[in-house]
């Protein structure tokens, strides 16, 4: 990776909350990240061959695991005073890691596993309900890192109050009901909006009434043209969402988790256009005109779109406008969305 691109990548993952990278400390230091590397100047030194243990450093070794004999070798080395071990398992992943987790925890040596995909990251952390102590995940984009964080349930988005400035009937249109394969809690919903940088938190249908039964797996998200977020942080059009698509579900604190879509339903319904303003940014959404579609208020309360008034405040995710190419954000590109 070219040096300039590497520094942008490191800055991006630092903004996502990553604190340690497997990288030469000279490169990691510029992004104010801790380094794990064979260099003695790393915070976490990976010993190679017969290299001596440097004083005042956390040290470990890297191992490939192909058999039980390799696991025994890891344990023997760990008992010599290693602070951590890095293991790379091949075809069999769960059983070897279960064996090492059980044994290494007794001698207080930390276990870091190599993962090859965001889904593997989550699996590594859930083994034996204890999980490994850390994962070394090869990522080429910030989106890869975001997706891994979503799998862990540690990804969050900044939500802020936005003031409703306009509400207007706009006739019939096609709206998308997203039925997820998850039971959604009160306060959870999807980020949806007509602009990629201004999205409303649209609540799920877990709240029933005397006329409707609860549908806690469903989000009546909005018109077909609207944006929502995929698990890598890139945008999707609601019209693209279908069985098997993975979308982000957020709570009122901005904490995100992934949800698989069981089906989406596109139906023609009367629609409302709603606009709001937050920190000088103005965004809108076209949602079905029905009592069951709710936004989330600051503090976690709910308000139906049919009861909204100018001046009301609802939670949105807003940031300065940026261009997008096939859903991926493009920095420094001029764009004006209305």
Swiss-Prot record:
Entry's EC annotation: 1.4.1.24
Reactions the enzyme catalyzes: 2-amino-2,3,7-trideoxy-D-lyxo-hept-6-ulosonate + NAD(+) + H2O = 3-dehydroquinate + NH4(+) + NADH + H(+)
Entry's Gene Ontology BP terms: amino acid biosynthetic process; aromatic amino acid family biosynthetic process
Group of enzyme by EC: oxidoreductase
Keyword annotations from UniProtKB, A to Z: Amino-acid biosynthesis, Aromatic amino acid biosynthesis, NAD, Oxidoreductase
GO molecular function: 3-dehydroquinate synthase activity; dehydroquinate synthase activity; NAD binding
Domain of life according to the entry: Archaea
Signal peptide residue numbers: none
Record's function text: Catalyzes the oxidative deamination and cyclization of 2-amino-3,7-dideoxy-D-threo-hept-6-ulosonic acid (ADH) to yield 3-dehydroquinate (DHQ), which is fed into the canonical shikimic pathway of aromatic amino acid biosynthesis.
Family statement drawn from the similarity comment of this UniProt entry: Belongs to the archaeal-type DHQ synthase family.
Protein name in UniProt: 3-dehydroquinate synthase
